[in-house]
Amino acid sequence: MSTVATTPKPDIHGAIRELWNHRAQDYDREPGHGIRTTREEWAWRRILAAAFDRVQTETPLRILDVGCGTGAMTMLIANMGYAVTGLDLSPEMLAVARDQAEERGLPITLMEGRADKLPFEDGAFDVVFSRHLLWTLPRPRKALGEWARVTRPGGMVAVSDGWWEEPGSEMRARRAIGGALRAVLERPSAASAAYRQLRPSLPLAGGLSPYSIRYYLDHAGLERIVVRDLKTIRAAERRSMPPWRWIDQARFTWIATGMVPE
């Protein structure tokens, strides 16, 4: 009796974990990753406070920062007075986050785990927040369903991301010029090559338009969806970017919020 050899499925989550492990030590130096200036910090504070104020509660909000990475947003949220838990796939990213939280004396819970397979009970949080995560996920719809599951009725899912590959001849030209300048002026990154290999497994690698994120949040069962342009964040980020990075900076980054039905 003959047997048919089967090809094992690639461990996509393991590959993603290794990519972010590799980037952990220098991740915050990238514009748009770490919060680099006071102007940027306060721009985020205003935006998040306006979003989270939509959630009614008599106690400090319980917030999950999913895909927290090195903890830049986790610590900002903690400094705003919220009870925050950070979760990330990468243990090296979490190690950086843990060191920074301890250095600042912030009471943050940090856990390793997958964004599409959360280790929490239904309704465990008032808010689930993510920044620059959705585009990195092999199963973004499943992840959004999980985020809605662990958010209590009347709570909020808040997603911040961007339209990284906005169509149109102008943006294609800007990306080409910006990429060429980075190739000359910046040290080549091994992570970039690893990302190119992963890209076919990431359905949202090019980002999402404001119309697309509305569809995804609606599909996850959320309601009262609001999408806000993050132009104040982009303006603050530019102040700490080298000039060649301005050229292909995404023209539309956003924060989208949706409420879990009561």
What annotation goes with each model-predicted range?
Residues L222-I233:
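Conserved S-adenosyl-L-methionine
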Residues A220, S240-E262:
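Core SAM-dependent methyltransferase catalytic element
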Residues R141-P153:
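A short glycine-rich, Lys/Arg-flanked "PGG" loop and its adjoining helix->strand segment in the class I
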Residues S2-E58, A72, M156-P188, K231, D248:
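Conserved class I S-adenosyl-L-methionine
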Residues P203-G221:
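Short alpha-helix
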Residues F129:
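A conserved beta-strand element that flanks and buttresses the S-adenosyl-L-methionine
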Residues R62-V66, T70-K117:
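Class I SAM-dependent methyltransferase SAM/SAH-binding core
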